[in-house]
């Protein structure tokens, strides 16, 4: 544990001491309002009650003047919390609005130390900037290349929710600005008290809805602390000193294990040669779920689970259930990750070998990475969104029946195209056809409900124009490059995988 503590101290960047005065600067609130400057595509705009959602410098200046008053921020948080459900007065509107402004501005400020650290580390490692690396689909080619050669996989659920004070202590290691940390405690205390007014198990939900930027920042800070353990143990257990990005920057330096009397000299290998093609451990995470895969034995994976559970208990001071980490063999197990069911298929092949006059057959096995669309969770998501029943029977969408015909078709078509675009990497697309069928028929039933007609009469009147809205761009491109095969028809091939490098978030229907 002492070695672990030294590792944590060594890896810390210089702490920031003067963040709190930035709350008195107007440009901070301009940055917080303009999400496009920060690439905040994940954050939906918040609609303030009783106010137009437009940015106003007058309100910002008024807020800054009031913040110069003594204990204004304390009263702001407390009054906003007490009056949220106490009536719709102008006093409540103004305090709630100011509280939201300060909260969003504070979110921008606390990101500054981490942004500087990220930029400096990328410049030191000379990591090339590429927009394609921002796509979450870029994870799947890595899994496709590595997963078929591994033996065991551990499906990890990162522990949540945790106490808010633990989040403050995590930031305290990076930020030593005491007023900023106290202000963060006030905001977290506000949502905790608001939780008591609504329900006892909705704290994280309310917090993430009202201030997504701050919520995801705290969440990523917490997950970053969890991943420090993985990097530490990986450096302690490997021959090569590797980095968290997986690149062997010091590939010419080797270390021998003296207990086995094995000393590997760097002179025996060329610097461009990779003596170990694959690391022992592969780690992939998205949001609160992670995958730890290894070529090692089942006992090795149990040791890693033991390390994780004990680390969470020691460092974060809370009990972590071992059942959050499932260890299974990749050949007999499929796990749900990022909207796909991932697994490894065993494909037997018979190879004919002929030597002079003798010929014989050699049976061989090839492991293949398999991606399946989970049809049951998708139908459940469509059912929650009122597109079908729990059994998958399409129904109309009454809430959209008052829209124009073009808007109704466009909304259904956009959902269908997004789902098809995201699941283009599936090796079996039969399930995707059922989802398309549900959305098409739900669209037709919605239009028939609006015009007080039947689906048959509506389709006869509209013709094939209704179906063209559900024809995805991938199908058009593939039909151009592969004219001899109908890839996306029911009688064609269904196993072509396409990983799109422009997807930066999971569709809400997929993520349910």
From Swiss-Prot:
Question: Which Pfam families does the record match to this protein?
Answer: Intron_maturas2 (PF01348), MatK_N (PF01824)
Q: Which PANTHER family match?
A: MATURASE K
**What GO CC terms are in its UniProt record?**
chloroplast
Q: Name one GO biological process term.
A: mRNA processing
| Signal peptide, first to last residue | none
Protein known as: Maturase K
Write out the entry's keywords from A to Z: Chloroplast, mRNA processing, Plastid, RNA-binding, tRNA processing
Q: Which organism is it from?
A: Lilium henryi (Henry's lily)
**Chief location category:** plastid
What is the documented function of this protein?
Usually encoded in the trnK tRNA gene intron. Probably assists in splicing its own and other chloroplast group II introns.
Question: For this protein, what is any one GO molecular function term?
Answer: RNA binding
Give the record's family classification.
Belongs to the intron maturase 2 family. MatK subfamily.
Please list the disulfide bridges: none
Query: Coiled coil where?
Result: none
The subcellular location is: Plastid, Chloroplast
**Is Cytoplasm given among the entry's keywords?**
no
Q: Which gene encodes it?
A: matK
